[in-house]
Protein backbone atom coordinates (compact mmCIF):
# COMPACT_ATOMS: atom_id res chain seq x y z
CA UNK A 1 0.00 0.00 0.00
CA UNK A 2 1.42 3.33 -1.01
CA UNK A 3 2.23 5.57 1.92
CA UNK A 4 0.40 8.86 1.78
CA UNK A 5 2.63 11.89 2.20
CA UNK A 6 1.84 15.34 3.50
CA UNK A 7 3.65 18.54 2.72
CA UNK A 8 2.70 21.72 4.55
CA UNK A 9 4.16 25.17 4.08
CA UNK A 10 2.79 27.83 6.42
CA UNK A 11 4.49 31.16 5.99
CA UNK A 12 3.88 34.52 7.62
CA UNK A 13 5.98 37.41 6.31
CA UNK A 14 8.28 34.89 4.65
CA UNK A 15 9.06 32.97 7.84
CA UNK A 16 7.97 29.38 8.30
CA UNK A 17 5.89 28.97 11.43
CA UNK A 18 7.61 25.70 12.23
CA UNK A 19 11.03 27.31 12.01
CA UNK A 20 10.93 30.80 13.56
CA UNK A 21 14.58 31.23 12.60
CA UNK A 22 13.42 31.63 9.00
CA UNK A 23 14.80 28.31 7.71
CA UNK A 24 12.82 26.51 5.04
CA UNK A 25 10.55 23.82 6.45
CA UNK A 26 9.76 20.71 4.42
CA UNK A 27 7.39 18.63 6.46
CA UNK A 28 6.90 15.66 4.17
CA UNK A 29 6.14 12.29 5.72
CA UNK A 30 3.49 10.91 8.06
CA UNK A 31 0.54 12.54 9.75
CA UNK A 32 2.68 13.58 12.72
CA UNK A 33 4.18 16.29 10.56
CA UNK A 34 0.73 17.68 9.88
CA UNK A 35 -0.17 17.91 13.57
CA UNK A 36 3.19 19.48 14.47
CA UNK A 37 2.60 22.19 11.91
CA UNK A 38 -0.97 22.81 13.07
CA UNK A 39 0.07 23.01 16.73
CA UNK A 40 2.77 25.52 15.86
CA UNK A 41 0.21 27.51 13.92
CA UNK A 42 -2.18 27.56 16.89
CA UNK A 43 0.53 28.81 19.23
CA UNK A 44 1.46 31.45 16.66
CA UNK A 45 -2.13 32.71 16.54
CA UNK A 46 -2.33 32.69 20.33
CA UNK A 47 0.74 34.91 20.48
CA UNK A 48 -0.80 37.29 17.96
CA UNK A 49 -4.06 37.56 19.92
CA UNK A 50 -2.58 38.14 23.39
CA UNK A 51 -1.89 41.80 24.08
CA UNK A 52 1.80 42.57 24.54
CA UNK A 53 2.95 43.98 27.87
CA UNK A 54 4.62 47.34 28.45
CA UNK A 55 7.83 47.31 30.48
CA UNK A 56 8.42 50.36 32.65
CA UNK A 57 12.01 50.55 33.87
CA UNK A 58 13.34 53.29 36.12
CA UNK A 59 16.92 53.91 37.07
CA UNK A 60 16.06 54.58 40.70
CA UNK A 61 13.05 54.27 42.97
CA UNK A 62 13.25 58.05 43.38
CA UNK A 63 11.77 58.22 39.86
CA UNK A 64 8.57 56.52 41.04
CA UNK A 65 6.48 59.70 41.58
CA UNK A 66 6.89 60.51 37.88
CA UNK A 67 6.54 56.92 36.71
CA UNK A 68 3.19 56.59 38.53
CA UNK A 69 1.67 58.88 35.89
CA UNK A 70 2.52 56.31 33.22
CA UNK A 71 1.13 53.53 35.39
CA UNK A 72 -2.16 55.41 35.79
CA UNK A 73 -2.55 55.80 32.02
CA UNK A 74 -1.79 52.15 31.31
CA UNK A 75 -4.32 51.08 33.94
CA UNK A 76 -6.93 53.41 32.44
CA UNK A 77 -6.50 51.72 29.06
CA UNK A 78 -6.26 48.25 30.64
CA UNK A 79 -2.85 47.56 29.12
CA UNK A 80 -0.76 44.94 30.97
CA UNK A 81 2.57 46.18 32.30
CA UNK A 82 5.44 45.50 34.67
CA UNK A 83 7.51 48.01 36.64
CA UNK A 84 11.18 47.41 37.43
CA UNK A 85 14.17 49.26 38.89
CA UNK A 86 17.33 48.66 36.84
CA UNK A 87 20.32 50.94 36.61
CA UNK A 88 22.41 51.31 33.47
CA UNK A 89 25.42 51.95 35.72
CA UNK A 90 24.83 49.92 38.90
CA UNK A 91 23.18 46.85 37.33
CA UNK A 92 24.33 46.89 33.68
CA UNK A 93 24.27 43.11 33.21
CA UNK A 94 20.77 42.74 34.63
CA UNK A 95 19.52 45.60 32.45
CA UNK A 96 21.07 43.99 29.38
CA UNK A 97 19.53 40.60 30.16
CA UNK A 98 16.10 42.13 30.72
CA UNK A 99 16.26 43.95 27.38
CA UNK A 100 17.56 40.92 25.50
CA UNK A 101 14.74 38.69 26.78
CA UNK A 102 11.99 41.32 26.65
CA UNK A 103 10.35 40.19 23.40
CA UNK A 104 10.53 36.54 24.46
CA UNK A 105 8.87 37.46 27.76
CA UNK A 106 5.86 39.04 26.09
CA UNK A 107 6.75 42.73 26.05
CA UNK A 108 5.90 44.92 23.08
CA UNK A 109 7.22 48.31 24.19
CA UNK A 110 9.81 49.48 26.72
CA UNK A 111 9.52 52.72 28.72
CA UNK A 112 12.69 53.87 30.47
CA UNK A 113 12.80 56.68 33.03
CA UNK A 114 16.09 58.11 34.26
CA UNK A 115 17.61 61.38 35.41
CA UNK A 116 21.02 63.07 35.31
CA UNK A 117 23.31 61.03 32.99
CA UNK A 118 20.19 59.09 31.90
CA UNK A 119 21.86 56.26 29.98
CA UNK A 120 19.12 53.75 30.78
CA UNK A 121 16.96 54.15 27.66
CA UNK A 122 19.99 53.97 25.38
CA UNK A 123 21.38 50.92 27.16
CA UNK A 124 18.04 49.13 26.84
CA UNK A 125 17.63 50.14 23.18
CA UNK A 126 21.10 48.79 22.40
CA UNK A 127 19.96 45.30 23.42
CA UNK A 128 16.47 45.01 21.91
CA UNK A 129 14.70 45.81 18.66
CA UNK A 130 11.48 46.58 20.53
CA UNK A 131 10.42 50.25 20.56
CA UNK A 132 12.01 52.11 23.47
CA UNK A 133 10.53 55.31 24.91
CA UNK A 134 12.67 57.49 27.15
CA UNK A 135 11.39 59.70 29.97
CA UNK A 136 13.99 62.27 31.06
CA UNK A 137 13.58 62.87 34.81
CA UNK A 138 14.16 66.22 36.48
CA UNK A 139 16.63 65.08 39.14
CA UNK A 140 19.38 67.70 39.29
CA UNK A 141 20.10 71.42 39.41
CA UNK A 142 19.87 71.42 35.59
CA UNK A 143 16.09 70.89 35.80
CA UNK A 144 16.21 67.74 33.69
CA UNK A 145 17.97 69.24 30.68
CA UNK A 146 20.94 66.94 31.27
CA UNK A 147 18.65 63.90 31.22
CA UNK A 148 16.76 65.18 28.17
CA UNK A 149 19.91 65.64 26.10
CA UNK A 150 21.37 62.31 27.26
CA UNK A 151 18.19 60.47 26.27
CA UNK A 152 17.45 62.16 22.96
CA UNK A 153 20.96 62.20 21.48
CA UNK A 154 21.19 58.59 20.34
CA UNK A 155 23.51 57.41 17.56
CA UNK A 156 22.12 56.39 14.18
CA UNK A 157 20.68 52.89 14.19
CA UNK A 158 19.73 52.80 17.89
CA UNK A 159 16.64 55.03 18.20
CA UNK A 160 14.93 56.09 21.41
CA UNK A 161 11.62 57.95 21.24
CA UNK A 162 12.02 60.68 23.85
CA UNK A 163 9.13 62.52 25.49
CA UNK A 164 9.24 65.75 27.49
CA UNK A 165 10.98 66.07 30.85
CA UNK A 166 8.84 64.14 33.36
CA UNK A 167 6.45 63.35 30.49
CA UNK A 168 5.42 59.95 31.80
CA UNK A 169 1.76 60.22 30.76
CA UNK A 170 2.71 60.87 27.14
CA UNK A 171 5.21 58.02 27.26
CA UNK A 172 2.43 55.65 28.26
CA UNK A 173 0.10 57.02 25.58
CA UNK A 174 2.80 56.58 22.94
CA UNK A 175 3.33 52.99 24.08
CA UNK A 176 -0.41 52.39 23.80
CA UNK A 177 -0.48 53.89 20.30
CA UNK A 178 2.31 51.53 19.25
CA UNK A 179 0.39 48.52 20.58
CA UNK A 180 -2.83 49.81 19.01
CA UNK A 181 -1.42 49.33 15.50
CA UNK A 182 -2.50 45.69 15.79
CA UNK A 183 -5.37 46.15 18.26
CA UNK A 184 -8.70 47.57 17.11
CA UNK A 185 -10.06 47.84 20.66
CA UNK A 186 -7.11 49.93 21.82
CA UNK A 187 -7.43 52.11 18.73
CA UNK A 188 -11.09 52.72 19.55
CA UNK A 189 -10.20 53.73 23.11
CA UNK A 190 -7.61 56.20 21.85
CA UNK A 191 -10.04 57.72 19.34
CA UNK A 192 -12.71 58.09 22.01
CA UNK A 193 -10.24 59.71 24.41
CA UNK A 194 -9.24 62.26 21.76
CA UNK A 195 -12.89 63.02 21.05
CA UNK A 196 -13.61 63.50 24.76
CA UNK A 197 -10.63 65.84 25.11
CA UNK A 198 -11.97 67.93 22.23
CA UNK A 199 -15.44 68.08 23.80
CA UNK A 200 -13.95 69.15 27.13
CA UNK A 201 -12.04 72.02 25.50
CA UNK A 202 -15.11 73.19 23.58
CA UNK A 203 -17.20 73.10 26.75
CA UNK A 204 -14.61 75.20 28.59
CA UNK A 205 -14.58 77.61 25.64
CA UNK A 206 -18.36 77.95 25.86
CA UNK A 207 -18.28 78.57 29.62
CA UNK A 208 -15.52 81.17 29.42
CA UNK A 209 -17.14 82.94 26.48
CA UNK A 210 -20.47 83.16 28.29
CA UNK A 211 -18.85 84.40 31.49
CA UNK A 212 -17.07 87.30 29.83
CA UNK A 213 -19.86 88.15 27.40
CA UNK A 214 -22.14 88.88 30.37
CA UNK A 215 -19.73 91.57 31.61
CA UNK A 216 -20.55 93.92 28.72
Which stretches of residues belong to each language-model region?
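C-terminal binding/interaction regions
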Residues: 58-65, 69, 145-216
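N-terminal beta-loop-helix "entrance" segment that forms/cooperates
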Residues: 83-104
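Glycine-rich phosphate/diphosphate-binding loop of Rossmann-like nucleotide-binding domains
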Residues: 52-90
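Short glycine/serine/threonine-rich phosphate/pyrophosphate-binding segments
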Residues: 63-67, 91-95, 114-123, 142-145, ...
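Short, Lys/Arg-enriched N-terminal segments with co-localized hydrophobic residues
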Residues: 31-50
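Cysteine-centered motifs
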Residues: 16-18, 25, 37
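Glycine-rich phosphate-binding loop
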Residues: 98-136
Amino acid sequence: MEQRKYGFFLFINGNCLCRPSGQSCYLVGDKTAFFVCIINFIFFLKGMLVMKKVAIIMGSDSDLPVVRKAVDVLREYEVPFEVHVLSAHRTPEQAKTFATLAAENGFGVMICAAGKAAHLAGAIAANTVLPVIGIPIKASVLDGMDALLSTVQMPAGIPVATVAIDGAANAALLAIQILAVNDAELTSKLVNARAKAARDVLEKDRQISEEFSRQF
